[in-house]
Amino acid sequence: MWNYRVVRTKEEQYDSYQLYEVYYDDDGKIEGMTENAMEPYGESVEELESDLVFMMQALKQPVLDMKELEKQFEENPPWAELVAGIRPYEFK
């Protein structure tokens, strides 16, 4: 599952807020996010409107902190469990 979330980045003189796609595991725990902030997109006006509606829903959710997310991903990298289960191919 994924949704848009507002993420705060603390700068030296000010904070900035941007929208990111955030991905969750089956328990609702954040397991990943887009590398870059998202912009509204659609291949039609209707799709663009739908994307904007999803983005507006992010404003009703708690703001996430970029430093906290970075710390979480350092301690438990996204997809770590999946990668840990992959064995290298052995040539014969």
Q: What are the residue ranges of the model-derived segments?
A:
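Residues in flexible loops and secondary-structure boundaries
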Residues: 14, 27, 41, 67, ...
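Low-complexity intrinsically disordered segments
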Residues: 45-92
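Generic structural signal for short, flexible, solvent-exposed coil/loop and linker residues
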Residues: 8, 12-13, 29, 48, ...
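Short linear sequence elements within intrinsically disordered, low-complexity coil regions
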Residues: 9, 22, 28-29, 46, ...
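A short, exposed loop/beta-hairpin motif centered on an aromatic-Gly-Thr core
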Residues: 31-44
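Short N-terminal "domain-start" leader segments
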Residues: 1-20, 25-27
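A general marker of short, structured functional hotspots
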Residues: 13-16, 20, 37, 50, ...
